[in-house]
């Protein structure tokens, strides 16, 4: 049967005044975010306070990692806590109501997440996902940049919580307590060239993220 594709402009959400006010001046941002999410589902954030230098450095570190020999990367293979390297063709996402993904994804990914100290009760109990990251030992400065990037994006996400609350007509402080011990999940992905994708084959199949917010750098 024939299908049509509807194209919509992505909304640009300007956080400049909001961040400059320390989060006190919400203005019309909640309404803008709600409209964007209800009508498109994604939006551009501008004047977000993340430096161009940091974005440049994280892309450079991603290239450095994915340029490593295959055996160096697979030595850090993803573990039961979902931290580590995932080879191309190893995953098939299923969280989508729009497409039944039947082929394995072609992307390669190195996964990092919030680290928890040995005194964390969940980690002491052996609860899954509460662990330390796996780090390559032959990339000087890599861990520092990845950690800085994750901490910076986490900070931005927390600053945006009052906007999400207001967009849902909730008190501005509503989400704060739920993110005091947040879990940040960072996928450092690489999409190697594929001469021709097969039918229903994707670099990363259609899916819905399970986290509260997802940031994609451009």
Where are these regions (language model features)?
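Peripheral, non-catalytic segments flanking oxidoreductase cores
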Residues: 1-218
């Amino acid at each position: 049967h024939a299908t049509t594709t509807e194209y919509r402009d992505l909304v640009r959400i300007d956080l400049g005044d909001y961040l400059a006010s320390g989060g006190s001046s919400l203005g019309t941002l909640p309404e803008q975010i709600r409209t964007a999410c209800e009508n498109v589902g994604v939006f551009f954030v501008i004047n977000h306070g993340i430096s161009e230098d940091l974005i440049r450095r994280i892309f450079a570190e991603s290239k450095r990692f994915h340029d490593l020999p295959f055996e160096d990367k697979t030595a850090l293979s993803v573990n039961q806590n979902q931290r580590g390297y995932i080879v191309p063709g190893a995953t098939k996402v299923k969280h989508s109501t729009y497409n039944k993904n039947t082929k394995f994804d072609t992307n390669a990914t190195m996964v990092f997440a919030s680290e928890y100290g040995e005194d964390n009760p969940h980690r002491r109990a052996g609860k899954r996902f509460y662990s330390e990251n796996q780090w390559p030992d032959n990339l000087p400065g890599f861990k520092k940049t990845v950690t800085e990037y994750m901490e910076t994006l986490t900070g931005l996400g927390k600053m945006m919580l009052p906007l999400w609350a207001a967009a849902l007509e909730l008190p501005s402080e509503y989400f704060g307590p739920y993110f005091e011990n947040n879990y940040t999940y960072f996928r450092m992905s690489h999409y190697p060239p594929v001469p021709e994708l097969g039918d229903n084959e994707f670099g990363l199949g259609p899916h819905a993220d399970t986290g509260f917010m997802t940031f994609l750098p451009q």
